[in-house]
Swiss-Prot record:
Its EC number is 3.2.2.23, 4.2.99.18. PANTHER family: FORMAMIDOPYRIMIDINE-DNA GLYCOSYLASE. DNA binds at H94, R113, K159. This is Formamidopyrimidine-DNA glycosylase. It comes from Mycolicibacterium paratuberculosis (strain ATCC BAA-968 / K-10) (Mycobacterium paratuberculosis).
Length: 283
C-alpha cells in the first residue's frame, strides 16, 4: 500500500499540473471506485463538472483536491494499488475514473485491486487545520510542519502495546505503514515488539525522528516501488526500494553490524529486523 512518501509524491505531481484547471466531463468506469461517495456516481460527476481546482493537500495516506467556490473537497485514497495519472488520453489498464480538464489533459484514476477511490466530502476545521470529514480523525503525520513529537511521545508512554502497532495506528501518528515502520525501527535500533509504555521519552523521540527522516529520504527518491502498482502522475516508479535497510531483507546482512536480518509475523504482515541491533525484548 502506498504510504506517506508515495502519496506526497503524487500530491506534488498533481499540484504542479492541475491547480488552476477546470474539470469537464467525468466518467466513472467502475462504480466500486466511488463507493465511498454515498450519493452515488451520478452525483459525483455532476458536482465535479465545471469545478476549478484551487489547491491540493494531504494528511497521512489521504490526499485531496480543493475546489473553487465550495466547502467540499475531492478526496482520493489510493488503497493498495491506486494511481493518479495525467495524460492526453486514459493511459493505463484498470482505469476506474477519468476526468477531462479544460486544457485537454485527462486525469485518470487507475486501480487494479479496487480498494481505493474518490469521494466528495465536506471540509471541517480541526485543531487549526481544514480537513475533509473522512480525514478529520487522523493524527498529524511526521512531515506535517505542525507535528508535535513531544505530544505524541506523551500518548505513546500511555500505550501498553507494541511500538510497531502504535506506529501503524493512524490516530496516533498518520502516514506510517509497514515498510516505513520497519525502516524507522531499524534506524532507531528498537525492536517492534517493545511495549511503548516501557520505553523512555528519548527512545520514543528517536523512533519518531527516524520515521520522519526515512520518509524524507524516501520522498527525495520518489517513494518505494516494488512493482508497477505504485507510480507517480507520469507513470514513473520510485526507487527508494534500493535503499531499504530492513524491509524485505530477510537473510541478508545488516548494513550496520553484519548480522543476518530476520523476518517474523506481525498483525498479518511481516516485520524485518536485525537481531543484534534490535534485540527482542524479554518477556
Amino acid at each position: 500500500m502506498p504510504e506517506l512518501p508515495e502519496v506526497e509524491v503524487v500530491r506534488r505531481g498533481l499540484h504542479a499540473h492541475v491547480v488552476g484547471k477546470t474539470i469537464g466531463a467525468v466518467r466513472v468506469h467502475h462504480p466500486r471506485a466511488v463507493r465511498r461517495h454515498e450519493a452515488g456516481p451520478a452525483d459525483l460527476t455532476a458536482r465535479l463538472l465545471g469545478a476549478r481546482i484551487t489547491g491540493t493537500d494531504r494528511r497521512g495516506k489521504y490526499l485531496w483536491l480543493l475546489l473553487d467556490g465550495c466547502d467540499t473537497a475531492l478526496v482520493v485514497h489510493l488503497g493498495m494499488s491506486g494511481q493518479m495519472l495525467l495524460g492526453a488520453v486514459p493511459r493505463a489498464e484498470h482505469v476506474r475514473i477519468s476526468a477531462l480538464l479544460d486544457d485537454g489533459t485527462v486525469l485518470s484514476f487507475a486501480d487494479q485491486r479496487t480498494f481505493g477511490g474518490w469521494m466528495l466530502a465536506d471540509l471541517l476545521e480541526v485543531d487549526g487545520s481544514i480537513l475533509p470529514r473522512p480525514v478529520a480523525h487522523l493524527a498529524r503525520d511526521p512531515l506535517d510542519p505542525r507535528f508535535d513529537a513531544a505530544a505524541v511521545v506523551k500518548v505513546l508512554r500511555r500505550k501498553h502495546s507494541e511500538i510497531k502497532r502504535q506506529l501503524l495506528d493512524q490516530q496516533v501518528v498518520s502516514g506510517i505503514g509497514n515498510i516505513y515502520a520497519d525502516e524507522a525501527l531499524w534506524r532507531a535500533k528498537v525492536h517492534g515488539a517493545r511495549i511503548a509504555a516501557t520505553m523512555t521519552g528519548r527512545q520514543l523521540t528517536a523512533v519518531l525522528d527516524a520515521a520522519a527522516e526515512v520518509m524524507r529520504d524516501a520522498l527525495a527518491q520518489g517513494g518505494t516501488s516494488f512493482d508497477s502498482l505504485y507510480v507517480n502522475v507520469n507513470g514513473e516508479s520510485g526507487y527508494f526500494d534500493r535503499s531499504l535497510d530492513a524491509y524485505g531483507r530477510e537473510g541478508e546482512s545488516c548494513r550496520r553490524c553484519g548480522a543476518v536480518m530476520r523476518r517474523e509475523k506481525f498483525m498479518n504482515r511481516s516485520s524485518f529486523y536485525c537481531p543484534k541491533c534490535q534485540p527482542r525484548p524479554r518477556l
